[in-house]
Regions:
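Central cavity-lining transmembrane alpha-helices of secondary-active solute carriers
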Residues: 46-64, 261-273
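Cytoplasmic helix-loop-helix junction between adjacent transmembrane helices
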Residues: 101-138
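Helix-loop-helix hairpin linking two adjacent transmembrane segments in secondary transporters
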Residues: 127, 132-189
Length: 392
């Protein structure tokens, strides 16, 4: 009976990872909004930056909240906020509507990322945590690479779009979010008392202080910066890859949307194969191989002008960046096992890199073309290479 319950819980958690991938629609969505509202790069990049801004604000409070209400209830709340975020764009595409929708999408994803990863540790712990988190990222990547296709099909009327064009993406993902919510609601997940009540007698202010104090540990701080670089490269490639194809190959946005899908296809392949490689290959070696792939990718994206070189470069960064988050996150959780909720909050706060990188990349690309954006991402890749010596 226990195995059956654990299997059901694991399935529900994996569907939540799929819902977590909804946030990656912001990359292709911002390109369509840029086209429809005639925005420049710096203004259009406000949308992905806004989504990830909320990781800075809500990650640590979510970690504290988990101590009060538990991990499962926090994930349920995140799904509710995400569903509302996906509902709003159905009714219009004004700048303000999109700002509100992307803000709520960012808040919901902050709650989800902070609580879902520790929930996985509740369902599957021990040596299988990193590989299970990687498999969750594989499921998440499926939602990520489907988004550009669904948006393009809606824009070209290849599928019924109900008069809203590319925005048909939102109601489709909203329906899946509702299914994920119901499945998790009816799944029994036993949480240890220490995971939900520990620290409840302390004041909220003291819990915040204890959480931020963890950044005083060198490994936690280095991991925090590593997460910032990972997500900066992720969001940066998501938004910049189509622009590179448009700039250098002179293709339309609908055709360039394939670049985002290609990135997430190889991220998906990377997560899936990484699930197995992490069981047989040393974590540090696999991390170094992944970062070297990204370094090669940055070189290709910086100087490449042919379709083959650009596609290979996008594939390399997709595969290389696919397992970085899981490796860093698992290392951080295992470094401070008695403070997993707090560490999770700090690591997810590092996703604020998804705000910092696109803003700098937007300014760089307006000044230097898309090569400027690639240089910004390359700085993040170089940091990850220096971080690799800390991976155990």
């Amino acid at each position: 009976m226990s195995n059956k319950i654990n299997t059901r819980a694991l399935i529900s958690v994996m569907l939540c990872f799929f819902a977590m991938g909804f946030v990656d629609l912001v990359g292709i969505a911002s390109n369509y909004v840029k086209k429809d509202l005639m925005l420049n790069d710096a203004t259009a990049n406000i949308f992905p930056s806004l989504v990830f801004f909320w990781f800075l604000i809500f990650s640590v409070p979510t970690g504290v909240m988990m101590n009060k209400i538990g991990r499962k209830k926090t994930v349920m709340l995140s799904l509710l906020v995400t569903i509302v975020a996906l509902l709003i764009p159905i009714f219009g595409e004004s700048f303000m509507i999109m700002l509100i929708a992307f803000s709520l999408l960012g808040i919901g994803n902050t709650l989800m990322q902070t609580s879902l990863n520790p929930l996985v540790a509740t369902v599957v712990g021990g040596n299988h945590l990193a590989s299970t988190l990687t498999f969750g990222q594989f499921v998440k990547a499926i939602a990520s690479f489907m988004a550009p296709y669904i948006a393009a099909w809606g824009a070209t009327q290849a599928i019924p779009s109900f008069g809203i064009g590319w925005r048909v993406l939102f109601p489709i993902y909203m329906a899946i979010g509702i299914v994920a919510s119901l499945l998790l609601l009816f799944s029994h997940i036993h949480e240890e008392k220490s995971a939900t009540v520990q620290g409840s007698s302390a004041t909220v202010g003291r819990q915040f202080a204890e959480c931020f104090k963890l950044l005083g540990r060198p490994f936690v701080l280095l991991s925090f910066i590593g997460i910032m670089c990972h997500v900066g490269i992720d969001v940066g490639t998501n938004t910049t890859a189509p622009k590179i194809l448009i700039e250098r190959l002179r293709v339309s946005l609908d055709d360039a949307a394939f670049a985002t899908s290609l990135y997430f296809i190889f991220r998906t392949i990377g997560c899936f194969t990484g699930t197995f490689f992490l069981r047989i290959i040393n974590n540090r070696l696999f991390f170094v191989i992944s970062v070297v792939m990204m370094l090669l990718s940055m070189c290709g994206l910086l100087v490449g002008t042919s379709k083959l070189i650009l596609y290979v470069s996008i594939a390399l960064v997709g595969y290389g960046n696919s397992n970085i988050f899981s490796l860093i996150f698992a290392q951080a959780l295992q470094n401070v096992p008695e403070k997993q909720n707090e560490v999770s909050g700090l690591m997810i706060m590092g996703l604020f890199g998804g705000t910092v990188f696109p803003l700098i990349m937007g300014l760089a690309s307006d000044a230097m073309g898309q090569a400027g954006a690639v240089i910004v991402m390359a700085v993040g890749v170089i940091y990850l290479f220096t971080y690799s010596k800390n991976v155990k």
